[in-house]
Amino acid sequence: MELLNISQSTLSRAMRDLSATVTNFRVGRTPYYALLRALPGGINPRQRISRILSTGHIDHFAEVEFLAGGGTLEITYNDGVRLYDGLPPYMSFAAPSGFLGRQLAHSVANRNMFPVSLKDWNDDHRVAFLFTEAVNLAGNLVFGDTCLQSELNFRKYPLVEAEEKLEYYVGMAQQLKTMSYGSSAGGEQPKFLWVGRDSGHVIVKFARRGSRMADLLPLEHLAMRSLAEVGVPTAETELLASDQFVFLEVRRFDRVGEQGRVGMLSAGAVDDEFFGKRDTWPEFAARCVNAGYLSKQDAEHVSVMAAFSELIGNSDRHFENISMLIADDGEYQGIAPAYDILPMRYASIGGGVDPELVPIEPKVGTIGSGPRVWALASKAAERFWSAVMTEELAAPISRPMRELAERNRKVALDFAAPFLPV
């Protein structure tokens, strides 16, 4: 006040007069003032966030204010005020990314506020999308009143009957295969979201028959089943095939019935917020156990997922491929069911190039030598490669992949043998 040569009351009156563009808040006993951000399309920088509970009921989550310079002010009923340097982790997680994200960017590109390419989006574009266009996001948060109304409208959409589903899937695949949405990362799987009467909420991956990815989708189905058989929770999957395409339905574990939802955050969002490491799955799980976010059982499941990945050639173990569930009370509920675990070392690398079908090369990495972890992973891997060798599925597995499975089964079992309980 001395530097400004004004009284506190004069400053307060000035701030009230500027309330449309300036906000004030306290961190502890210290008052702060901040300029609100100008967002694309003139979107209000003050917004509400709701959440959909597992029962389908809608609850208040937080109010947010977007500040000049990129910060975000979060106001909740329980925890008071929190200031983030950028977007809160749940917004970064919910923002469009990957193949689905490029679909969304393409669909809103006719609005002047959004660049055509997702690569050109910044946080302002992400905020604008989340609070004007986002519907049916991962997790249970709904951003803004406009999107809340869209979610209520979404509940009224008629569900497609099971016998009509494959026809719709083929139509979606035909439409999406002609759209690149910008340069796709090598091996990234085309997919779309679906709600069916028989399947519920699913993510549908697809590939043209005869392609390498058409070989790998049945393997993802078998990998999920093999992990589940040794006690690791996994996403439920189902294979379908038409004359042209192979489809893999992955049941969404963040959905409960037709209307209920479960909160979730990727390991990347959690790690960025609390640890800033992004090293390996087992190390992340160990940190979460120490912080009280995960149980030792959860950490063991993560280690089994990592060890199993080594034994099947899953080289794509980034921090968006495991997630944590959040209960209705806002507490971490545990590790999410396993998903996106398959032999990605054989996935197409772009430009029509497929890696050679050579045997896997497992490594210990940071998994350690725990006998129970390797016993479970080895058992799952044996079941997996045996199924790849012999099982007849709705979508066929090629002869070269079946022949490779026999060699990989031996490599996996030989590698795990020294770690197994005596």
Regions found by a protein language model. Name each.
Residues 2-319, 323-422:
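Phosphate/dinucleotide-binding and metal-coordinating scaffold of catalytic cores
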